[in-house]
Curated annotation (Swiss-Prot):
Name of the protein described by the UniProt record: Dihydropyrimidinase-related protein 3
Region annotated Disordered, chain positions: 506-570
PTM-bearing positions, type Phosphothreonine: T509, T514, T543
Phosphoserine found at: S259, S518, S522, S536, S539, S541
Residues carrying Phosphotyrosine: Y431, Y499
Cellular-component GO terms for this entry: cell body; cytosol; exocytic vesicle; extracellular space; filamentous actin; growth cone; lamellipodium; synapse
InterPro entries noted in UniProt: Amidohydro-rel, Hydantoinase/dihydroPyrase, Metal-dep_hydrolase_composite, Metal_Hydrolase, Metallo-dep_Hydrolases_sf
Lineage, highest ranks first: Eukaryota, Metazoa, Chordata, Craniata, Vertebrata
Function: Necessary for signaling by class 3 semaphorins and subsequent remodeling of the cytoskeleton. Plays a role in axon guidance, neuronal growth cone collapse and cell migration.
Encoding gene (name): Dpysl3
Organism: Mus musculus (Mouse)
Length: 570
């Protein structure tokens, strides 16, 4: 039965709001102007606005006013082996709002062999009842057959889903074959959807995991040792190749290594329609913590693909994000408690994977990229909000400050300093992988659906107030080039006359040989005759049938001086 939504879900009554004296920052321009909002929409932008009475005025005092962040990758309330991630849609979206994010896109992860549509309806019910901010959904394809293909078509055309993820890892669970990858990409390209991939070589990982365990390596360090970055890079290259062959846009989730990031950059320079999504963790921290003596701390960093042990990787990935080689950012927020992680205390392959990052995402990027001079304020808006809205066909409703856009806004203080700590973050998780980091840049005011959610350090959220935002297919930002290439790549057979020459008969059997059509041996030379040992004259009991018979094809050569009859060296 299709989930229709609870009748009593609270909805936000939008305030009439006026932001005065702010500097509006979009992805392509910055300018000073006032903003008037009503009914959850931006109604006016300019100076000396004429607004109705009873309007609440917020003084921006020259601070930046930016579009609310869009976190394109979360796992809230995700079931896993009888457990559930500790941050549900209420706690997760509350953390998002605290960090300046006003919309999330969560991943629906169906159990293998189960219905994608039923999983989608389950996620909708959970999110509609608990989400504090707007949300959309990706659907992960955890197996593939004709029935799943029909569900994908229905979800795309009728349910507001325009992105589907496939796994190239997790052998014998979610992993798809190369043939299935080709079929899925072909299907998604025809639907105008976006093909997302979790890029790792699952076959080799399975072998490496077994090797590590045989060596007695059972702790979290085994996770990164069994998943070297070459396995991420190989899968990224393979996915790019298949996407190119099927003319399907590709979206690589969780870009964690230099090698993977470089491949995406190179492919884009060659004209491939591919997008790369680094996450809060890969932008803000490295994988040296896997070798911590504190097992719980090391386990908190376990995620796949793993964080790179190379401490220069975060700076490198931030540089590619700033240059446009990578296009947007997610958090991959997927939090388990220490007790839940501890089911893998004796076997690293059993540690539930996932890290926090939804609350820290925007501050990490500001601190690592903008404050260091790699990225300007407009690029910051692009990689935290606008590019996501464009890719998933939400623009300009989301991701832009313009008349008619949703009133999802953030007053951002570039000079604010915040020390990250699990003691005061909004996540339920006991551990924060960014613990102790001092980050520059933070939200002062967060407005979602025209309602103030964060002000003066205090959150004012309403459980269940978030709306599902459907994502329609064929995003112009993604598909304009794809459509043009389809027209150019219209294939035709070469017109030629019928061949009327001789045709080799594959059923003919040459004398003394195997049939000409046999697949054994060389296709151009007949196989030599094989001796039938059952008809051999060889005997184990004495004289052979052919003994003493000189072969016509052999010469017998005696040494100089004749034959020797030496039987002893003494």
């Amino acid at each position: 039965m299709s989930y229709q939504g609870k009748k009593n879900i609270p909805r936000i009554t939008s305030d009439r709001l006026l932001i005065k004296g702010g500097r509006i920052v979009n992805d392509d321009q910055s300018f000073y102007a006032d903003i008037y909002m009503e009914d959850g929409l931006i109604k006016q932008i300019g100076d000396n606005l004429i607004v109705p009475g009873g309007v609440k005025t917020i003084e921006a005092n020259g601070k930046m006013v930016i579009p609310g962040g869009i976190d394109v990758h979360t796992h809230f309330q995700m079931p896993y082996k009888g457990m559930t991630t500790v941050d549900d849609f209420f706690q997760g979206t509350k953390a998002a709002l605290a960090g300046g994010t006003t919309m999330i896109i969560d991943h629906v992860v169906p159990e293998p062999e189960s219905s994608l549509t039923e999983a989608y309806e389950k996620w909708r019910e959970w999110a509609d009842g608990k989400s504090c901010c707007d949300y959309a959904l990706h659907v992960d394809i955890t197996h593939w057959n004709d029935s799943v293909k029909q569900e994908v078509q229905s979800l795309s055309k009728e349910k507001g889903v325009n992105s589907f993820m496939v796994y190239m890892a997790y052998k014998d669970l979610y992993q798809v074959s190369n043939t299935e990858l080709y079929e899925i990409f072909t299907c998604l390209g025809e639907l105008g959807a976006i093909a997302q991939v979790h890029a790792e070589n699952g076959d080799i990982i399975a072998q490496e995991q077994a090797r590590m365990l045989e060596m007695g390596i059972t702790g979290p360090e085994g996770h990164v040792l069994s998943r070297p970055e070459e396995l991420e890079a190989e899968a990224v290259f393979r996915a790019i190749t298949v996407a190119s062959q099927t003319n399907c846009p590709l979206y690589v989730t969780k870009v964690m290594s230099k090698s993977a990031a470089d491949l995406i950059s190179q492919a884009r320079k060659k004209g491939n329609v591919v997008f790369g999504e680094p996450i809060t963790a890969s932008l803000g921290i490295d994988g040296t913590h896997y070798w911590s003596k504190n097992w719980a701390k090391a386990a908190a960093f376990v995620t796949s693909p793993p964080l790179s042990p190379d401490p220069t990787t975060p700076d490198y990935i931030n540089s590619l994000l700033a240059s446009g080689d990578l296009q947007l950012s997610g958090s991959a927020h997927c939090t388990f408690s220490t007790a839940q992680k501890a089911i893998g205390k004796d076997n690293f392959t059993a540690i539930p994977e996932g890290t926090n990052g939804v609350e820290e995402r925007m501050s990490v990027i500001w601190d690592k990229a903008v404050a260091t001079g790699k990225m300007d304020e407009n690029q910051f808006v692009a990689v935290t909000s606008t590019n996501a809205a464009k890719i998933f066909n939400l623009y300009p409703r989301k991701g832009r400050i313009a008349v008619g856009s949703d009133s999802d806004l953030v007053i951002w203080d570039p000079d604010a300093l915040k020390i990250v700590s699990a003691k005061n973050h909004q996540s339920v998780a006991e551990y924060n992988i960014f613990e102790g980091m001092e980050l520059r840049g933070a939200p002062l005011v967060v407005i979602c659906q025209g309602k103030i959610m964060l002000e003066d350090g205090n959150l004012h959220v309403t459980q269940g107030a978030g709306r599902f935002i459907p994502c329609s297919p064929f995003s112009d930002y993604v598909y304009k080039r794809i459509k043009a290439r389809r027209k150019m790549a219209d294939l035709h057979a070469v017109p030629r006359g019928m061949y009327d020459g001789p045709v080799f008969d594959l059923t003919t059997t040459p004398k003394g040989g195997t049939p000409a059509g046999s697949t054994r041996g060389s296709p151009t030379r007949p196989n030599p005759p094989v001796r039938n040992l059952h008809q051999s004259g060889f005997s184990l009991s004495g004289t052979q049938v052919d003994e003493g018979v000189r072969s016509a094809s052999k010469r017998i050569v005696a040494p100089p001086g004749g034959r020797s009859n030496i039987t002893s060296l003494s």
